[in-house]
Amino acid sequence: MASAPVKAAAGAGAAQINDFLAYSTGAAEQRALQNPTVSRSKDLLASLIGCLEMRHYSKQWTGERYEEIYLPVEPWMEQPDPKVTRNFFYSNIFSDLFFHGRAFAFVTSRYSTGLPASFTWLPAAMVTTPNQTGPQWFGPSDVVQFNGVEIGDSNDVIQFLSPIQGLLYQGARALSIATHLDQAADRYATLETVPGYLQQKGGETLDSDSLSEIAAAWSAMRRQNAIGALNDYVEFKEFSVSPAEVVGEQRKYQSLEIARVSNIPAYLVSAPQEGSGLTYTNVQDSNRQLYLYGAKPFIECIQQTLSASNVLPRNRFVKFDIENYLEEEMHDVMVEPYVDISEESPS
């Protein structure tokens, strides 16, 4: 199927589109990605979605059901943004859906029919919609601002709306707890000795200032030397339960909470679960579970948005080739080893 001639997209759009010096994904997203479980969850899903091929088809009624008739792909289906790879484009579209619950692509050129021919990704953190402040998005916005500049024609912006609220909203409490636990672990990592306290054993009772001076001197000495010195009147005592161990257990549990709010099977992000282990069945089904529980809502959001009438003609659709992906991955992931258990014949 020959592509129609291409012409520039109507409307100048926001002045700062493609001015990458002004681009930002937002402090909240960058802070969330510092958590290893969040980073792992996002990367697992992005590696799946960003690597899928796109298929182009129409539907034909057979008298009993609709049959998919596959068509040649348009150039933008292979490379939505001519300046970057398909992997880059869709991975970032997914990332915005994952964190913000919506994503945006600006139409940079159109066919002679008026339908989009190419796109560029707009970071969701830089997009504002005056009539919707979130976290629940109720539909496409008629007024779209990019970095504070209103885009002249909102039809030049393809708006992807996730069926799931963004992680930065629905996971705000879990992320806050995880951040505080990471900060506590960072503090304990700088301790020169085991956590404990100094206790006066005898002599004249010291006031708070004197006790503070002794504690500061003890801490400073421990930072400089492996051995500290105390007199007969002061004793160092370890805490019965190490705060570092308590924080460690809390961080393990919080990694499980992050996996839950990310809709990722816990074992895929190495989050510990009581009474469970990684079995052969888990490994064999991992890609299918990642798709069903984590990636499918985002995949459906992207392919249905790009199949809408403002992108494709009537009865034309696109979808990711998830069937071949799962078939190939399930075949290559793991082959159950053959073990010869035949009994030795008695001598």
Task: State each model region's role.
Residues 227-228, 266-277, 308-312:
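Short acidic alpha-helical/loop segments enriched in Asp/Glu that coordinate divalent cations
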Residues 259-262:
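Short amphipathic alpha-helical "interface-anchor" segments enriched in bulky aromatics
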Residues 284-319:
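Long, compositionally biased
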